[in-house]
Amino acid sequence: MGAVTVRGLRRAFGSHVVLDQLDLTIAESEFVALVGRSGGGKTTLLRTLAGLDPVAEGSVEVPALRSVVFQEPRLLPWRRVWQNVALGLPRSRGRDEATKALAEVGLADHARAWPLTLSGGEAQRVALARALVREPELLLLDEPFGALDALTRIHMHALVRQLHERHRPAVLLVTHDVDEALELADRVIVLRDGRLDEQIETRELFDDRRDPRFEQARARLLGLLGVTDTHVADPTATPSSAATAP
């Protein structure tokens, strides 16, 4: 059985149907990226899987242990960094586990810092530590790198890959960034007109973006999203800008 099983999910806001009889399965430890146009229902789906939005129609099966990382880190400014990570953990082991989680994301020396002293990338690493300290079976990422600069995004991508390999949760990443989706995910899905329109099994296609099939998959995804791409990639270069859906 998969970590996530969704059948016939429908969600509408007034007369606007956002999710239309949507079906989705995510296997245990699988990393799935979801791309689509703005307002197309990506975040609505993620919030439903997180239990933040109700299931009005259809069925949703998800693990009890799940965590969410949003674009904004949402740290409590009046609590120290380690206390933000330890929120909800038993007091007897909260500090030790928070410290270990911070070490995993390279912030062991920031445990007693205040959130307002952190850079954007550091704050998002704290949010990742907070999400993973509970060892979730499902990790939901809602455009977690969208507010970061290009260099910080590259570092965060590497960190997320390492953490996924170490902890092995199932992951759903919502993103507008096609390159990001292709580089991180085992499978990239396009959400269009409220349904999962098409998917690309990236793990079977290439190991890194220097493979020519990366550009082929990239062009295909951008075409599905209605984006005209004039970019010609240097396969030896690390991207400094993102190809994003409108």
Swiss-Prot record:
GO cellular component terms, A-Z: plasma membrane
Origin superkingdom: Bacteria
Disulfide bridge partners, by residue number: none
EC nos: 7.6.2.14
Amino-acid positions noted as binding ATP in the UniProt annotation, renumbered to this chain: 36-43
Cross-referenced PROSITE patterns: ABC_TRANSPORTER_1, ABC_TRANSPORTER_2, SSUB
Compartments (UniProt record): Cell membrane
GO molecular function term, any single one: ATP hydrolysis activity
Limits of the ABC transporter domain: 4-218
Entry's transmembrane regions: none
Span of the signal peptide: none
Chemical reaction(s) catalysed: ATP + H2O + aliphatic sulfonate-[sulfonate-binding protein]Side 1 = ADP + phosphate + aliphatic sulfonateSide 2 + [sulfonate-binding protein]Side 1
Membrane-related topology note: Peripheral membrane protein
A Pfam family this chain is assigned to: ABC_tran
Entry keyword set: ATP-binding, Cell membrane, Membrane, Nucleotide-binding, Translocase, Transport
Record function comment: Part of the ABC transporter complex SsuABC involved in aliphatic sulfonates import. Responsible for energy coupling to the transport system.
Family, as annotated: Belongs to the ABC transporter superfamily. Aliphatic sulfonates importer (TC 3.A.1.17.2) family.
Subunit structure: The complex is composed of two ATP-binding proteins (SsuB), two transmembrane proteins (SsuC) and a solute-binding protein (SsuA).
Protein's UniProt name: Aliphatic sulfonates import ATP-binding protein SsuB 2
Gene source species: Frankia alni (strain DSM 45986 / CECT 9034 / ACN14a)
